[in-house]
Every structure is written in C-alpha cells, then in structure tokens.
C-alpha cells in the first residue's frame, strides 16, 4: 500500500482553546487539571 499525501483542509471553528481551561484564575493544586 503506497503512502499518499494527506489533504490539508482549513476549517472554521468557533471554539477557542481557552474554553477548556479553568473558568477563573483562582487555581488550586488539589484540583485535577486537564493537562
């Protein structure tokens, strides 16, 4: 099976990466973080 070059498509996405962070800046070490 030959390797084929993947097609790169740029898509519009309304979500930003900062949505997945904490809602406020008050961070606690005892809380489970996403990363």
UniProtKB/Swiss-Prot annotation:
Its name, as the record gives it, is Coenzyme PQQ synthesis protein A
Q: Which residues form a coiled coil?
A: none
Pathway entry: Cofactor biosynthesis; pyrroloquinoline quinone biosynthesis
Query: Which is a GO BP term held by this UniProt record?
Result: pyrroloquinoline quinone biosynthetic process
Described function = Required for coenzyme pyrroloquinoline quinone (PQQ) biosynthesis. PQQ is probably formed by cross-linking a specific glutamate to a specific tyrosine residue and excising these residues from the peptide.
Arranged from A to Z, the UniProt key words for this protein are:
PQQ biosynthesis
What is the top-level taxon of the source organism? Bacteria
